[in-house]
Amino acid sequence: MDEDKDIDSKESGEYEDDFEKDLEWLINDKEKSNGSTIEMACKKEDDLDQVLKENETETELGQQLSDPDNSPKDEALPRRNDFISVPSIQPLDPISDSDSENSFQDSKPENQKDLEDEEDEEVRRYIMEKIIEANKLLQTQEPVNDKRERKLKFKDKLVDLEVPPLEDSDTCKALLENETNMSGKLSQLCISGDLEQESVLVSVTDGSCEENDRKILVERDGKFELMNLQDIESQGFLPPISSANSVEHESSQLPLRAPNPSVGGIKKEESEAKGHVLPISPAGEPLAQVPQLLPNPKNRPSSAANPDVTKKARRSNHRIQSAGVSPVTSTYCLSPRQKELQKQLERKREKLKREEEQRKLEEENEKKKENEMVFKAWLQKKREQVIEMRRVQRAKQIEDMSSRQVNRDPQQAFRLWLKKKHEEQMKERKTEELRKQEECLFFLRGTEGRERAFRQWLRRKQIEKIAEQQAVKERARQLRLEARRSKQLQSSLYSIPEAKAFRFTDHYN
């Protein structure tokens, strides 16, 4: 808990430092803006000071040149300021070095004091002017708007969650003491290494008690039962346990007992998962107090570290993955009845699978049959439509032919025939002209041209022959059609019987 408090305090401290840094940044920006104006003012002051110093040095040099007695001062000033190099003028009266040094030292402090006083006055004057200007600016500025939304906002309560310290320190101490007592008593036990079959804790009583009277509390399937030690040993869960005095002598001589074959693997797994035994005295009272959970454990935040969970995770990482997980298909721990049930379930699954496949095949066959029936119906419908269209076209052709025979104009037919003849003659003329042009080119080209012209002539002859045959066929077809039409007309004219033509009918009776 102390570590959690330290972590929370560190996080809150870092959170407060961030806000302090933001405030310092805002303050520094304001100081920089004010400092820039002050730097400009200082630069102006330095420039004025340099100008004043130059003017003073020039006036002093002019006075020294006019007065020959002040020659040592003239030599000292150019060395100190290095503004103007003036040649040294030898005085008329010889003066010793000690006198010149004394006079220079006397004049130096006076000049420095005068310069410092003037600089102080200039600085004061400049500062006063700046103060007056700043006051004027502040008076002219608009008041600050407090309702303006600020970018940097602060919460009333900076820390959202505070973890209270544990108040049950006394209960924790009691739990630790109980654990140490239990570990001390368990260390007195001497049980053989075959403890993986069932997790049983046995309390060793004093040697005065008889072995037959000792009882142990065993948990099975959520129920607690008092059992004798001999019954547990006979079932093979534990090796025989002697008294505390004879354990040290006989522990090396005890043979390891094999588990009872009547106990199946399922019982072992259940005993490993659920078997918890408490040490009981012969009177039936527990020897040691078992640690219990807190009555009202407080809810801790999820960020708090849980050392038990981390330790378990570390331990589990070192184990092999297959050690804790048994294969699903393994049947080594099943009883014969369970194996039979498993086989029945597998048979049911296979049967359902076969039925599902059969049902799918039947559905596919039904769909195929339906598709074939639909296709046949569509094909029959299309055939009927084609037959109907042909019948209608034939009827129209017969009507057109009959109308042409009835309303036939010989002059119009002659004009059509004359037009066709004219078109045929024009085509023949064009072909004749092309042939003549090819023959002219034939005499100019040589042997290659002759062969090509011969091949073209043969092709043209074949085309003409085919055209004549088609014309003969067309003429014969037209003759057959005319003969058929004439027969139809004759049959329609002579179909009325003669008796009906000369019969008298009285329409008034």
From Swiss-Prot:
GO terms for molecular function: microtubule binding. One of its GO terms (cellular component) is cytoplasm. Residues 335-377, 418-488 form a coiled coil. It is found in: Cytoplasm, Cytoskeleton; Cell projection, Cilium, Flagellum. Predominantly expressed in testis. Expressed at lower level in brain, eye, trachea and lung. Barely expressed in tongue, heart, liver, kidney, spleen and muscle. Present at high level in elongating spermatids, whereas lower levels are observed in round spermatids (at protein level). Belongs to the CCDC181 family. Microtubule-binding protein that localizes to the microtubular manchette of elongating spermatids. This is Coiled-coil domain-containing protein 181. The gene is Ccdc181.
